[in-house]
UniProtKB/Swiss-Prot annotation:
The lineage of its organism: Eukaryota, Viridiplantae, Streptophyta, Embryophyta, Tracheophyta. This is Small ribosomal subunit protein uS4c. It comes from Dioscorea elephantipes. GO terms for biological process: ribosomal small subunit biogenesis; translation. Residues 89-150 form the S4 RNA-binding domain. One of its GO terms (cellular component) is small ribosomal subunit. SUPFAM superfamilies: Alpha-L RNA-binding motif (SSF55174). Keywords: Chloroplast, Plastid, Ribonucleoprotein, Ribosomal protein, RNA-binding, rRNA-binding. Pfam families: Ribosomal_S4, S4. One of its GO terms (molecular function) is rRNA binding.
């Protein structure tokens, strides 16, 4: 299944706020209306919707998300928490969290078009897994700097996650540590996502 490129508001109206996909928010009460219209949700549908939330927020294909679930399942620790850490440490998501891109699809474009350096080298792979002490900067070209500057200036200035630091004057971000999955703050039950895939096998 390919990455979703359809109407974004349609997705947030059904699934709720997905800040990685779009800065728009669903109207208050829309979740209740949807639930009333479709009746009581089955356990399968609840797990499916949590999986869809995670997939659309991070802008992944079905295959990509399944691969991350498999990697998390083989790692030490709780599968659901490792899964979130893997997704949060992707370069496209780090750019979004730093405010250097307004959404994860916008961050992916910056990376694909070679505007981003990690530790002084161009990285054009959005799924690149960032590590502690990685330094993320824009390429030393006017167009690259303008794109980053516009995003930083228009970002909602929410409190930066503790695992990241940004110098907005030098267009430079620093990864301080691997994120604690408990501090991610998404309204997604990642355990239900893992359960969804475990029941598919």
């Amino acid at each position: 299944m390919s990455r979703y490129r359809g109407p974004r508001f349609k997705k947030i109206r059904r699934l709720g706020a997905l800040p990685g996909l779009t800065s728009k928010r669903p109207r208050s009460g829309s979740d209740f209306k949807n639930q009333s219209r479709f009746g009581k949700k089955s356990q399968y549908r609840i797990r499916l919707e949590e999986k869809q939330k995670l997939r659309f927020h991070y802008g992944l294909t079905e295959q990509q998300l399944l691969r991350y679930v498999h990697i998390a399942g083989k790692a030490k620790g709780s599968t659901d928490q490792v899964l979130l850490q893997l997704l949060e440490m992707r370069l496209d998501n780090i750019l979004f969290r730093l405010g250097m891109a307004s959404t994860i699809p916008a961050a992916r474009q910056l990376v694909n078009h070679r505007h981003i350096l990690v530790n002084g080298r161009i990285v054009d792979i959005p799924s690149y897994r960032c590590k502690p002490r990685d330094i993320i900067t824009s390429k030393d070209k006017q167009r690259s700097k303008v794109l980053i500057q516009n995003s930083i200036e228009s970002s909602p200035h929410e409190e930066l996650p503790k695992h990241l630091t940004i110098d907005s004057f030098q267009y430079k971000g620093l990864v301080n540590q691997i994120i604690d999955s408990k501090l991610i703050g998404l309204k997604i039950n990642e355990l239900l996502v893992v359960e969804y895939y475990s029941r598919q096998t």
